[in-house]
A protein has these predicted regions:
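Bacterial N-terminal signal peptides
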Residues: 9-22
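Short, flexible, surface-exposed loop segments at domain boundaries
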Residues: 2, 22-203
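Positively charged n-region of N-terminal signal peptides that target proteins for export
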Residues: 1-4, 8
């Protein structure tokens, strides 16, 4: 998958309280990608690895839409999340980046392993510096106990968040879900990120 809450204007309250631990838990679960069907209160989803999973919507689930943004939207002092791959020269190259609204500043702050690809990492941090180049930008990302420089290629998908609600969670929707396994072994979705206008959440 946090320390801040999403603004009431987004209709997403209390995100910080739930998601800090869930991000780590989500890395051990299949990333969830497409809503297949709805069986009563259960959403049947197809994970990236092809597995079919049954997810219950938590009573206090946080729902947000994901829309396309651009590299030029990432500016100094933006708070972003960047999935990156290690490079032969020891640097990091972004696979994707998502721009958090101001009210989500601090969400999942840090640098840690991620499950998008083997050896991929996630860095959620403040943009300290942006250096532009013909083929992309290099971001200096500063978080509570360190910093990373990550090159963002011009073709890396960039997205941001918009308000969402339960009506967005429907068959065919492309999603990223932070799901937690309950004591009974069933999965409960606490944070739902739904692609809008043909966008696939790239995290």
């Amino acid at each position: 998958m946090f320390r801040r809450t999403l603004a009431r204007s987004l209709g997403i309250i209390g995100l910080a309280a739930i998601l800090a631990a869930q991000l780590a838990q989500a890395q051990d679960s299949p990333p969830i990608r497409v809503i297949e069907r709805v069986d009563g209160a259960i959403y049947v989803v197809r994970a990236r690895d092809g597995a079919e999973l049954k997810i219950a919507l938590a009573d206090n689930a946080q729902i947000a839409g994901i829309i396309k943004a651009s590299l030029s939207d990432i500016k100094q002092n933006s708070f972003v999340g960047v999935t990156a791959m290690p490079q032969p020269d020891g640097g990091l190259s972004a696979v994707e980046a998502h721009i958090f609204p101001e009210a989500m500043r601090g969400t999942g702050e840090g640098h840690y392993p991620w499950d998008l690809r083997p050896q991929s990492t996630m860095t959620n941090a403040n943009v300290e510096q942006v250096v532009s180049a013909v083929d992309g930008r290099t971001l200096t990302l500063k978080y509570k106990d360190g910093e990373k420089k990550i090159t963002v290629p011009a073709n890396a998908p960039i997205v941001t968040y918009v308000p969402g609600d339960k009506s967005d969670i429907k068959p065919g929707a492309k999603v990223f879900i932070v799901a937690v396994k309950q004591a009974n072994g069933k999965l409960q979705g606490r944070a739902w990120r739904i692609g809008r206008d043909g966008v696939t959440p790239p995290m």
